[in-house]
Amino acid sequence: MSVFVMEIGTEELPARFLSGLEQEIASRFEAALAAANVEFGTLNVQSTPRRLALTIENIDAVQREAEEVVSGPPVRIAFDAQGRPTKAAEGFARTQGAELDELFTLTTDKGEYLAVRKKTGGRPVQEILSEVAPEIIAALPFPKKMKWGSGDFTFGRPLRWVLALFDSEVVSFTVAGIVSGNETCGHRVHGPGPFEVSGADAYAGTVRDKCHVTLCAADRRRVTVEGGDALAAQAGGRILWKDSLLDEVQGLCEHPVPCLGDFDPSFLELPAEVLLTSMESHQKSFGVAAADGSLMPHFLTVLNMTPQNSALVKKGWERVLRARLEDARFFWKADLASDFDSWLAKLDNVIFLAPLGSMGDKTRRLERLCRWLAAAVAPDIQEQAARAGRLSKADLVSEMVYEFDSLQGIMGGIYARRKGEDEIVAQAVSEQYLPAGPESPVPDSLCGALLSIADKADTLAGCFGLSMIPTGAADPYALRRCALGIARIMLEKGLRFDVRELFRYAQEGYGERQWKLKPEQAAEKLHEFFVLRLKNLFVSQGHETLLVEAALHAGADDVWAAGARLEALDRFSKSAEFGQAVLTFKRAANIIRKQGQEEDGGLDGCYDASLFEDEAEKALAGALEDIAPDFEARWAADDYHALFGLLGVLRPAVDAFFDSVMVMCEDPHIRRNRLNLLQSLVQRLGRLADFGALQM
């Protein structure tokens, strides 16, 4: 078995491109080799800022042979009445490179066709790779592509060399005017090269030993973490590692060398969030914390070389960071000299969404909506919730957030504390943007949860009124994330209120506006959108789709209750009684769904016991009446597990009813009474789940 190595050498690629390119190269080569019937063992793609390296081990040297049957024209037109081949048969044979006597009749469901057996494969794999490699390189996707020189070829950054080796032989092809070869280039300082690679097996060693490049991203990360931890320990601290920044840093270097720098301790007067953002955002550096968690006047950066004069390089990094921190200190002091009233006034000049008014308008709506939410779930914090809503966006006009927009909300909370606001208000303001994604936590405080819900509901109501509804992958205002955030907060914090009422109240907060959708139409579309997001959330948590639909059809306006009913239904679905219970109660639900609408005036679930003719009718009515007090008590206690357990009490009476009672009898009064008896059953069970949506 053989080894194939291909290295695409480029100018420095952005770190954010690398992970996606690794996946694209791997998937495209896997697909191309599968289509060509070439087998291989392992396929691995690694990257640095200046190279994309593919290694395929245990790859066949020769394409696997296969036989395929190619069908041609129908037999009836392939031969004339005398059985002689027609032009259709001759043309088919010629096209397939076959002799007429090699053709045979293929019988299919559609009739008889002329066909030929063809052997494929047997080509040297090097030939196949020389064809697919340049095609794959040219087709690699980038957020942005560029041209260079006088050619028309486009890529993420200019190509500089291409190495392609099949064992010790060069796989020859041309891409972007560059002819593939057996040479690679190394680190710009420590081993620029070019260096000849004797064979595919020698590639990794050449890159490591001669190029002085750490090809594996995991190895670069390990070198960074181990070296950084050692330097921090010498200073008596620990590095505040951040995974996303670590990923970015390893994508910025080929030869990582951790370097610990210092800054003036006077800068520690700034909030830790400001210091860390200055380091991480602008300098791609990490903070250092003491044992008690407080920041120390040090930072860790990662160099892309081993410097000859470490002290000089360290001094340069410190000088740049000092300038950043001086700016941050200026913003901090300027913001502390301002007050919330002046910021709130400025919000009236900051646009939220042009048709939806200013940020000042939004904070007034949030004040109103937060007060309403608090009245529903926590009346004792109504005033704090309203105040948090009013102050929520004030930091958007602060100097600090203007410079570091990632600190919005966080700085609002910090400034609220410094300016004497209630701690409940300050924490809520700092948590208002949570959760920021599927892995992000929800707000820790109740007031923060209410503010976050209000903010998201206000955005949803406004955008749906303007018909800015997400379609496909397009969601410019992150409305899906807003809906999921509301659902997660309600579920994880155990908040119970009617989401229809939430959206209606949020919609009313906009007052009279020129909407693109009528308010009732927008409200209905928003509710459907929210329920779909809730469904997706439950499915992503591992619940079966049919169970989720059954639970949500029974009611989704109380999100926490819907989740609790789903958990109980999920547990019930694993019991031995589930299958028969579904068949029984689904039958009742389907009868009501199909026949109920045909009854004049509909069905209300009220039946007349004097019209019962069969003992089974009386038994079912009696069973419903017997469990009613227990059912309502357990419903009030949210004991959904016990409620599903009551189905076992009801099922024998329902089964007996269906066995002996003709529901759709001739007498319209008796028929309607029996349908209302079933409606009474379905109404009660329908509060738990829509059994008609379940299947067995």
Curated annotation (Swiss-Prot):
Q: What is its EC number?
A: 6.1.1.14
Q: Which GO terms describe its cellular component?
A: cytosol
Molecular function, one GO term = glycine-tRNA ligase activity
Q: List GO BP terms, alphabetically.
A: arginyl-tRNA aminoacylation; glycyl-tRNA aminoacylation
For the protein in the UniProt heading, the enzyme class is ligase
Q: Catalytic activity, per the record?
A: tRNA(Gly) + glycine + ATP = glycyl-tRNA(Gly) + AMP + diphosphate
Q: What keywords would UniProt list here?
A: Aminoacyl-tRNA synthetase, ATP-binding, Cytoplasm, Ligase, Nucleotide-binding, Protein biosynthesis
> What is the first-listed, main subcellular location in coarse terms?
cytoplasm
| Intracellular or extracellular location(s) | Cytoplasm
| NCBIfam families xref list | glyS
Assembly, per entry: Tetramer of two alpha and two beta subunits.
Q: What's the family?
A: Belongs to the class-II aminoacyl-tRNA synthetase family.
Protein's UniProt name:
Glycine--tRNA ligase beta subunit
Q: What is the lineage of its organism?
A: Bacteria, Pseudomonadati, Thermodesulfobacteriota, Desulfovibrionia, Desulfovibrionales
